Curated annotation (Swiss-Prot):
Disulfide bonds: none annotated. Belongs to the peptidase M24B family. CDD domains: APP-like. The lineage of its organism: Bacteria, Bacillati, Bacillota, Bacilli, Bacillales. This is Uncharacterized peptidase SERP1271. The keyword Hydrolase applies. Mn(2+) 2 binds at residues 215, 226, 333. Keywords: Hydrolase, Manganese, Metal-binding. Binds 2 manganese ions per subunit. It holds the Pfam family Peptidase_M24. GO terms for molecular function: hydrolase activity; metal ion binding. It is an enzyme of class 3 (hydrolase).
């Protein structure tokens, strides 16, 4: 319940009576219980001076009781109004404005006589930004399993194999290691198809002397990994190899700069300057990276407009890329833990 204590500190700082959390991943973050309730109400109420209250469909109550959550559980039937089961008045409520619908907010106002709302999204992002020891352990395991996925995929490469065949093989084989969920749709792209940064694997067949781009991640105990490797099948042409070398240098130098106190936009600049000086600046169309945790893309953006500083306990990706249509697409991505004195690279597959 340490994380709930942290959000209660936010309530005190903002002079608010309660927080209303409805994003399933944020509810999991604070309670240890995960659910996807679809259209049904699933919400965590955190009053400033009372125990937390979890609203959930009645059919999930026994599951909640088996979870780490310690607080009041309000289960309701589909024919019942869950707000009828809890009577309190809160003058000021913190809400996830990025997630809460207008309809739900009207219901809250009526149920709890709320006079004022304030956004809590950023406060939760700040909490999730710094990982606990347990979270780091899970992300490290997810990263190791992502390494295994690349190994599985590379060993399956052969002339004439289709992109989607490789995807299916990776996802089937990694299940043997206890993986039930990928972080996102696995991407395997051949040759200049990889010049589309978010291309969709299809029936393109692998030919000799092409690059193969793998972008994938694994979920382990709810935590994600996200890595990219670009591997040559045969001998790439001179321009493609040059592009690869530039991207590798950009990633290597950016990672070397990582430590607490470094301004995030400066890391992006290191990689971007290398790519621009090589003449490929127009072919690097995305940010350098992002946060990683319960979601494969989360706070913070590693970008040229982020003036925040790195802190120990953050887990981020570094993923420069160059995408030249009809020539080649190269991206290299690693998961990085910011440590007290520098960094630790969590994804270890060779480059």
């Amino acid at each position: 319940m340490t994380k709930i204590k942290e959000i209660k500190k936010v309530l005190q700082q903002e002079d608010a009576d309660a927080a209303w959390i409805t994003t399933p991943l944020n509810i999991f973050y604070f309670t240890g219980y995960r659910s996807e309730p679809h259209e049904r109400l699933f919400a965590l109420l955190i009053p400033s001076n009372e125990e937390p209250v979890l609203f959930c469909p009645k059919m999930e109550v026994e599951e909640v009781k088996q979870s780490p959550f310690k607080g009041k559980i309000i289960g309701y039937l589909d024919t019942e109004n869950p707000f009828d089961k809890y009577s309190k008045t809160f003058s000021k409520m913190l809400i996830e404005s990025e997630h809460l619908t207008v309809k739900r907010q009207r219901e809250l106002t009526k149920a709890f006589n709320i006079e004022h709302y304030q956004d809590v999204d950023q406060s939760i992002k700040d909490l999730r930004n710094i990982k606990s020891e347990d979270e780091i352990i899970n992300i490290k395991k997810a990263a190791a399993l992502a390494d295994k996925c690349i190994e599985i995929g590379k060993s399956f490469l052969k002339e004439g194999v289709e992109e989607r065949e490789v995807v299916n093989h990776i996802e089937n084989e990694i299940k043997k290691y206890g993986v039930n969920e990928m972080s996102f749709d696995t991407m395997v792209l051949f040759g200049d198809h990889a010049a589309s940064p978010h291309g969709t694997p299809g029936d393109r067949k692998l030919q000799q002397n092409e690059f193969v781009l793998f972008d994938l991640g694994v979920v382990y105990h709810h935590y994600c990994s996200d890595m990219t490797r670009t591997i040559h099948f045969g001998t790439p042409n001179k321009e493609a190899q040059n592009i690869y070398n530039i991207v590798l240098k950009a990633e290597t130098e950016a990672i070397k700069s990582i430590k607490p106190g470094v301004t995030i936009k400066d890391i992006d600049k290191i990689a971007r300057d290398i790519i621009e000086e090589a003449g490929y600046g127009d072919y690097f169309p995305h940010r350098l990276g992002h946060g990683l945790g319960l979601e494969e893309h989360e706070y913070q953006d590693i970008s040229s407009v982020n003036n925040n500083q790195l802190e120990a306990g953050m887990v981020i990706t570094i993923e420069p890329g160059i995408y030249v249509p009809h020539v080649a697409g190269v991206r290299i991505e690693d998961d990085i833990l910011v440590t007290e004195n520098g960094y630790e690279i969590l994804t270890q597959y060779e480059k």
